[in-house]
Amino acid sequence: MTGPRLRIWATIVSLIALMLCVASPLCGQEKLTAIKGGDIYTITSGIVINGTILIKDGKIVRIGQGLDIPKDANVVDVRGKVVMPGLVAAATMGAAPSTDKIADSLDPFNYSVSMALASGVTSIFVTGRGSPGESVGGATAVIKPTYGDMDNMLLKEPAAENLNIASYRWMDRTNFILKMRQAKEYLRKLADYEKAKAKNEKLEAPRKPGDIDSYLRLLRREMPARLSADKAGEIMKALELVDEFPFRLVIEGGTEAWTVADAIAARDVAVILSPREKQRPNEDISQPSGSNVENAAILKKAGVKFAIIPAVSHFYMTMGGFAGRDLMTLPMDAAAAVSGGLDEQTALEAITITAAQILGVDDRVGSIQEGKDADIIVLGGHPFHYDTFVELTFVNGKLMYDKNKSVYFAHIRRYDEKVPGMPPDIRQIDPNALPPRESQRRAGQRPTPIH
């Protein structure tokens, strides 16, 4: 066969192979991953004991017991561990600069990203500062801490409209109301125009006032509004706005929400709260006030949807202690709500699926379900135990954090665990291997005198 003919046949064979590859569902896909043997807290469908999760192309494909695992699969043995969806941080502070788009300012190599993974957080609401004098503004997004992977970091943008109308700045509130009324009037005129246009095609559309796009999104309920309010009076003022303009509202803070829980529930307003936030009661009024450890439980009883965040909700939660053993992480604040009477299931939902619902990303994250993103964490114990570490964190099916390989946390262990390659802890030394006097001292006995 001559050279030109050989090249032609080689081209034909290559094209056929390419067509077969495109037609095959397996071609170009990642190898299947199986997380096997753990107790799976699905959040929405109970707990699967000694279960297996099959992951392919970043998605959960199957969940159950005794699943057939392909021989070439990447098997992660997590026997004796707790497996649950990655945590969802429904609010953060100082996570993004004041840019028009969060996507333009993301840094996948930021130290905070690795700390989020170590804390088991796989979805994070971030916000930038709005322009001074604007009652609505500031970029918002939901991101994933995909360390080193910029392409898969952004989950949703925009995610909400920030309301900058603090109770002590009456002008901001007045400006917000005026803009909302302008937007409401424009929508009324637009509806009238659409009806009349069928009879008169030459009719001119109403002129849209400037700077009302954000307000239109609120009135059309395309985007929720987020407003910081802690005291009962602040919360009630926010609810008055919902009465006049029926937009979707999320209250951040809600320290005294327990005192007006029924009013919040009646307007279908969500709350993002910190169970351990402290606020002294107002001694100048006769009504209940101040913080209450039963805040979350009271809101649950009233039918209010809420998410839980730490009192200091920085991008990576906080590093006041060690991630995974830090008393300021999401599970510890959820545990504080349980101590106030909230049931464990609702507390888990408040840091996973309910938080995802409030952020509008529950179709992808927040629970372990077939078809959802494989954002999964593996814990060394019960999520609400103070001594539990995050051991593995998967984002989009990829292992993003392994505690045993972490430069920050590999050496940190429970008191009864040995550290590979490290000298034994002083509490793990066999007393019989110690000199007699040292053994007696540790046993609380009086050492034998030396003659």
Can you annotate each of these PLM segments?
Residues 38-41, 369-413:
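C-terminal cap of metal-dependent C-N hydrolases
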Residues 99-100, 224, 265, 274-277, ...:
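His/Asp/Glu-enriched, well-ordered alpha-helical/loop segment
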Residues 40, 44-84:
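Histidine-rich, glycine-flanked metal-binding segment
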Residues 1-14:
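Bacterial N-terminal signal peptides that target proteins for export
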Residues 175, 179-250, 255-271, 290-303, ...:
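Histidine/acidic residue-rich metal-binding segments in metalloenzymes
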Residues 30, 77-203, 303, 439, ...:
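Divalent-metal coordination cores built from histidine and acidic residues
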Residues 30, 308-317, 321, 394-451:
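Extracellular/periplasmic ectodomains of large secreted or surface enzymes and adhesion receptors
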Residues 11-23:
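Bacterial N-terminal signal peptides
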